[in-house]
């Protein structure tokens, strides 16, 4: 994601570069913000009978947002508050921006605190990890997962039904050839930055004939192998970036040294005001439910150089964080 911050005008100019960037834009755009950009809408000049689709530069005051992870789309709705000179009859009418990868938009935040918090979110997005197509395979099944900074999404299963009869070697090759074909189909669809093969070492030796990618030997393949890949220290950098490691440390401190942990908005806000936060974990849905309160916390954490992790609600960590009040922090002292 490319972005530029104009602090004097409280404006962020952003060009999303891939679908994951749309998620971070969804988080930092609030109701009441002004979003500007090039768009196409129906325009009927005075004195004409029929309208036509015209490209124009508009600004809308945000009333609603709609983000679809699986479609990779972000829509922003609201009344038009700014329009380029020479375009009449559009201001005040409602419009929907489709924010897509490769198209720049401007976001004008309502106050300085929200702008500073938005910078923290953008810094997190800038350090986003490669998108990984994980192929977890053993001699019984293969599971395919899409691993990004947004979490782990299991895409597809393939069972080795041919194991029921026939020659073992040829049947395994038949199954692995099907794994290779499925991998290529998913590679074309999702365009990952890399493919990672995970599973028992002896199986990986065979899989490599059909699928090209980084090999990660582990004890299990299939769906169990997906969870093993995420839980074990096989991809520590990835785990750290999306908050797994911070959440594990938070749970450990809750059990052994609870004074080093703050949970819930009130306690976390107090810790943020005192500059005590080392790592902040915030539920994505909690941001949309309480934007002013959460942006204030994120802004203070960002100023004190805290690590910030935004956690999706539809993950294992998200369920635990929701039970803690939607926000939690590991404290420096």
Swiss-Prot record:
Gene Ontology cellular component terms for the protein in this record? cytoplasm
Q: Name one GO molecular function term.
A: metal ion binding
In which broad location class does this protein mainly occur, judging by the first location in its UniProt entry? Answer: cytoplasm
Q: What is this enzyme's class at the first EC digit?
A: hydrolase
Keywords tagged on the record: Cytoplasm, Endonuclease, Hydrolase, Metal-binding, Nuclease
The protein's required cofactor(s) are namely: a divalent metal cation
Does Metal-binding show up as a keyword for this record? yes
Task: Show the Pfam families listed in the entry.
Answer: eRF1_1, eRF1_3
Q: Where in the cell is it found?
A: Cytoplasm
The protein's Enzyme Commission number: 3.1.-.-
Q: Which GO terms describe its biological process?
A: nonfunctional rRNA decay; nuclear-transcribed mRNA catabolic process, no-go decay; nuclear-transcribed mRNA catabolic process, non-stop decay; ribosome disassembly; RNA surveillance
Q: Which InterPro entries does the record cross-reference, listed alphabetically?
A: eFR1_2_sf, eRF1_1_Pelota, eRF1_3, Pelota/DOM34_N, Pelota_arc, Ribosomal_eL30-like_sf, Transl-rel_pelota
Gene3D superfamilies noted in UniProt: 3.30.1330.30, eRF1 domain 2, Pelota, domain A
Give the domain of life.
Archaea
Q: Which SMART domains match?
A: eRF1_1
Q: Which HAMAP family match?
A: PelO
Q: What does this protein do?
A: May function in recognizing stalled ribosomes, interact with stem-loop structures in stalled mRNA molecules, and effect endonucleolytic cleavage of the mRNA. May play a role in the release non-functional ribosomes and degradation of damaged mRNAs. Has endoribonuclease activity.
Record comment regarding domains: The N-terminal domain has the RNA-binding Sm fold. It harbors the endoribonuclease activity.
Entry's family note: Belongs to the eukaryotic release factor 1 family. Pelota subfamily.
**By its UniProt entry, which PANTHER family does this protein fall under?**
PELOTA, PROTEIN PELOTA HOMOLOG
Quaternary structure and partners: Monomer.
* Protein name, as recorded: Protein pelota homolog
Recorded source organism is: Pyrobaculum arsenaticum (strain DSM 13514 / JCM 11321 / PZ6)
**Top-level taxonomy:** Archaea, Thermoproteota, Thermoprotei, Thermoproteales, Thermoproteaceae
């Amino acid at each position: 994601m490319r972005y530029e911050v104009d602090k004097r005008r409280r404006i962020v100019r952003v060009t999303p570069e891939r679908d994951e960037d749309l998620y971070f834009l969804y988080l930092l755009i609030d109701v009441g913000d002004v979003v500007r950009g090039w768009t196409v809408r129906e325009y009927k000049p005075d004195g004409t009978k029929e309208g036509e689709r015209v490209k124009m530069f508009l600004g809308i005051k945000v009333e609603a947002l709609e983000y679809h992870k699986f479609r990779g789309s972000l829509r922003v709705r609201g009344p038009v508050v700014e329009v380029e000179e020479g375009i009449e009859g559009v201001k005040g009418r409602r419009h929907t921006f489709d924010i897509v990868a490769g198209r720049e938009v401007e976001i004008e935040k309502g106050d300085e605190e929200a702008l500073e918090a938005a910078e923290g979110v953008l810094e997190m997005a800038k350090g986003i990890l490669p998108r990984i197509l994980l192929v977890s395979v053993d001699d019984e099944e293969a599971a395919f997962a899409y691993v990004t900074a947004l979490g782990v999404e299991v895409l597809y299963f393939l069972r080795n039904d041919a194991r029921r009869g026939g020659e073992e070697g040829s049947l395994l090759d038949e199954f692995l050839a099907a794994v290779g074909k499925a991998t290529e189909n998913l590679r074309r669809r999702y365009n990952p930055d890399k493919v990672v093969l995970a599973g028992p070492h002896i199986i990986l030796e065979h899989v490599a004939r059909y699928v090209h990618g980084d090999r990660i030997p582990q004890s299990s393949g299939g769906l169990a192998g997906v969870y093993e890949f995420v839980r074990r220290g096989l991809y520590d950098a990835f785990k750290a970036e999306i908050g797994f490691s911070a959440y594990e440390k938070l749970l450990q401190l809750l059990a052994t040294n609870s004074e080093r942990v703050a949970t819930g908005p009130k306690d976390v806000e107090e810790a943020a005001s005192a500059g005590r936060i080392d790592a902040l974990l915030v539920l994505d849905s909690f941001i949309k439910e309480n934007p002013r309160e959460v942006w204030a916390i994120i802004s203070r954490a960002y100023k004190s150089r805290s690590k910030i992790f935004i956690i999706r609600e539809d993950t294992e960590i998200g369920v635990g964080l929701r039970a803690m009040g939607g926000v939690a922090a590991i404290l420096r002292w």
